[in-house]
Amino acid sequence: MHIERVPGIALSPSGAVAAYLGDWARVAPAYEYDWRRQESFERRAAYLTGGGYAGDRAAVAAALERYNRALGADEASLENARLLGRPETLAAVTGQQAGILTGPAYSIYKAMTTIRLARQQSQRLGVPVVPVFWIAGEDHDWHEVSWVMVPAGNETRRLALSERFDGERRSVALAPMPASVSDLIDEFAQLMPDTEFKEEVIAHLREAAVGGPALDPEATGGAPSLADWFGRLMAWVFRGTGLVFLNSSDPALRRIEAPFFARALQQQAEVEAACAAGVDRWERELGFACTVEQTPNSLNLFIYIDGERLPLLGEGDRVWVRGRPDLSWSRSELVDLALRSPERFSTNVVLRPVVQSYLLPDLFYVGGPGEISYFGLLRDVYRAMGRQMPVVVPREGFTLVEPPIARILQKHELTLDDAFHRLDDLRQELLEREDRLGIAQAFASFRQDFERRHAELAALVLQLDPGLGQVVEENRRQIEHQINRLEEKAKQQHRKNCETALRQFDRLKANLTPNGLQERAFSILPYLVKYGPDLVRRLVDEVPLEEGWSHRAIYL
């Protein structure tokens, strides 16, 4: 397995993320810890074990063991779930929405980063560090999670659920699996080449989709949810790595979070002020664009009513559902409801990272560019809720290079820099290089001759009759049109003669940079079909963890 850095690739075009990776002094006021320094992990560990974390370890560990068992996780994950009940154990956390076919590959790379960094820090700190994947089961952005791209030869194909999700506000963990999942699996199977691994991968896709609910049978009518399918697939993909899965909609975890919800309801003013201070620092002091939309009077909480996840607002003693003033409570009534029925509440983007630190002794969080920016707004929110922000580590970036793609690169003597940044220009250069007849030059020379000879002819005609100027000009335009048409026909034939090479360039683009980076477009599952269900475990074990950040190509 050969690994090579890809030059010129950024985690994000955001100036804030670029500064986070390479100009720490500029962003330091917004975060608690410098992710590049081992001292940060040591200080964070000392903070957590010295009283900074006071969560119910036994209850969290029991809930996670039960949930992972329901997902079919292996003994390595179950043992790690139990380890979280021990007082010295720390957590390494990442997370993502529950996408179909495990979503874009960067979800996989977030987990890979977390597992490998957890192993490193466990060795360096001398304590167990358990990798945890936070499945955002409470999320209701169905449009974002209902589709994914897969490579298909020289093209990319979009696979999507056929249901319409306009206005859908049920959480992905609490709604029955969409019926079109079966058709989507069939379509995926048809697109995949026949390999020795295909039958096993497709069979597991189907089995994971029809298993019983992993969380609340009542909420989904006894059917599995999209989050269940995602969790079972992820547990299968990461078997042997010790990755523990957490579903944010787990009623057992909600019960542990009840005091957190009550505090958020009681300290709305403090949280609002802290969030405003973070936004002000981010925009005015640091000069970055804010990535969180602030809603006046927001409690940064949702409430579930008739299965729908609805945002809460509050002012004074009154709390109500945004856009539904008929659904209102006194603040004390809602605090009481949160303590009695915490499963009816969930956090928004502002409090989600904070509740993570309430539940888990999180040494660090591995995030993508958007999350890095979110965390930069929340240092004071953590403090307002009696917590402290963990070390925030950027996820690793990868592109998988298959053997046929590597052969095309080698055949055309292309570097990764060429393939990622100059492919269109090099494609045109190939056409020009293979043009042994000099098509472009021949037509350019002919045009020059034509312009000169036509001008001479026009002068003669206009001497005969100056009123023929319009006819002369129309004649010139018609002849130019025919010349252009003939040139295009010649170029088309030339491209046809170069078709094999051009198809290879198209294949490079479709596989390496499909509408952007591969990791943001493709699911990992097509690569499991081709290279085996244990591919991700092999990547976890064999790809070295780098200091700093770079985007790397992995030659399979």
Swiss-Prot record:
GO MF annotation terms: ligase activity
Pfam family, one: CC_BshC
Record function comment: Involved in bacillithiol (BSH) biosynthesis. May catalyze the last step of the pathway, the addition of cysteine to glucosamine malate (GlcN-Mal) to generate BSH.
Keywords: Coiled coil, Ligase
Protein name, UniProt field: Putative cysteine ligase BshC
Family classification: Belongs to the BshC family.
EC category name: ligase
InterPro entries: Bacillithiol_biosynth_BshC, CC_BshC, Rossmann-like_BshC
Coiled-coil residue spans: 408-442, 468-513
EC number: 6.-.-.-
Superkingdom of the organism of origin: Bacteria
